[in-house]
């Protein structure tokens, strides 16, 4: 059975990931950056993307890639494990991205993540994206 403190942390991690999707899709880059540990590692190589190290580098690259696109990120079915000031989770995900030149992406897969608690706040320390499905429509 999950204890009350663990459940509060579970909810905090789930809310962190919900904010990740919302801030990314609304292009609130300052709020988006605040979700990550300073030394975050974001690895999208399994999905054909880059490996990014450090908050500033990661947010800058994500912003450059998606700032002009309309995006919808959805996560669900979390498997969250809390261990003191660290947590791990696997999230089922789906994303849709549409660029103004007509290029579109529709994808699904999983985020595999590690979180750390810093000064009482949960932050994303590692994120690895794997894809099960990708459909790309080339630009016009």
What are these regions (language model features)?
Residues 11, 69-71, 104-106:
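Transmembrane beta-barrel outer-membrane domains
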Residues 88, 108-138:
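Short beta-strand edge/turn micro-motifs at domain boundaries
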Residues 68, 96-104, 134:
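Short, cysteine-centered beta-strand-loop-beta hairpins and adjacent loop/turn segments enriched
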């Amino acid at each position: 059975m999950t204890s009350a403190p663990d459940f509060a942390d579970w909810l905090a991690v789930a809310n962190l990931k919900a904010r990740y999707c919302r801030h990314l899709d609304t292009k609130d880059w300052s709020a988006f950056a605040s979700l990550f540990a300073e030394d975050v590692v974001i690895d999208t190589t399994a999905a054909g993307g880059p490996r990014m190290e450090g908050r500033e580098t990661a947010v800058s690259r994500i912003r450059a890639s998606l700032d002009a696109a309309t995006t919808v990120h959805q996560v669900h079915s979390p498997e969250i494990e809390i261990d003191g000031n660290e947590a791990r989770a696997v999230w089922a995900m789906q994303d849709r991205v549409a660029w103004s030149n007509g290029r579109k992406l529709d994808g699904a897969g999983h985020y595999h993540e590690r979180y750390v608690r810093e000064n009482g706040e949960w932050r994303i320390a590692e994120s690895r994206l794997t894809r099960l499905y990708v459909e790309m429509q080339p630009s016009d």
